[in-house]
């Protein structure tokens, strides 16, 4: 092979390596921050039946969007329906022990992944022991204090959540401010339980 051909081949291999995105985590896991995955628990591990309405304001860098979410959860399923401010169905998610089924409107950005929406909900509202166990395989830890959840990787906070219901109150009733520091997004969520 001539030197010129070797250089072309090397350049093509380098270009290919630079344009490939990181591998997706193994099945059943969701990347929630660089180097941190959440092993998705079962919907049953929420350990309650609940119907919730939420108003969500999401901020990503300079963009802000608002939407309404309706949640229905029981031992055998977790359903999430997202509706935009014009009343259009943006996304529907049905999660069971068999997996996640999602339907997105064509205008919803491709990088808005149902698995990540569910992972955010799990990290906010699932029992502390379940969240801690789901983060542990990738080295993540949960530090929980009254009104605060902090998720850390190698002693550095990567996710921070502040709950505004009174300490001891149901976190599904009230406000929460959630920040994913390395991915540079924040969620302000106002929740109201419709049926326990």
Give residue ranges: language-model regions:
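A short, Trp-centered hydrophobic/proline-enriched beta-strand micro-motif
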Residues: 43-60
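N-terminal beta-strand/beta-hairpin edge segment
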Residues: 55-86, 95
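Acidic/charged, solvent-exposed loop-and-adjacent secondary-structure segments enriched in E/D, K/R, S/T
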Residues: 101-130
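Gly/Pro-enriched, hydrophobic low-complexity segments
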Residues: 139-196
């Amino acid at each position: 092979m001539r030197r010129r051909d070797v250089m072309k081949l090397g350049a093509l291999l380098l270009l290919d390596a630079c344009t490939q995105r990181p591998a997706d985590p193994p099945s059943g896991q969701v990347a929630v921050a660089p180097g941190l995955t959440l092993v998705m628990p079962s919907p049953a591990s929420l350990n309650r039946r609940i119907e919730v309405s939420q108003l969500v304001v999401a901020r990503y860098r300079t963009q802000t969007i608002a939407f309404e979410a309706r949640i229905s959860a029981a031992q055998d399923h977790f359903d999430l329906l997202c509706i935009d401010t014009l009343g259009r169905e943006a996304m529907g998610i049905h999660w069971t022990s068999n997996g996640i089924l999602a339907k997105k409107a064509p205008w919803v950005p491709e990088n808005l992944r149902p698995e990540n929406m569910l992972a955010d909900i799990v990290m906010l509202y699932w029992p502390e022991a379940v969240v801690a166990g789901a983060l542990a395989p990738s080295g993540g830890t949960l530090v929980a204090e009254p009104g605060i959840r902090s998720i850390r990787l190698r002693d550095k906070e990567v996710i921070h959540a502040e709950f505004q219901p009174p300490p001891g109150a149901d976190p599904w009733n009230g406000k929460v401010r959630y920040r994913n520091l390395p991915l540079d997004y924040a969620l302000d969520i106002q929740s109201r339980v419709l049926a326990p």
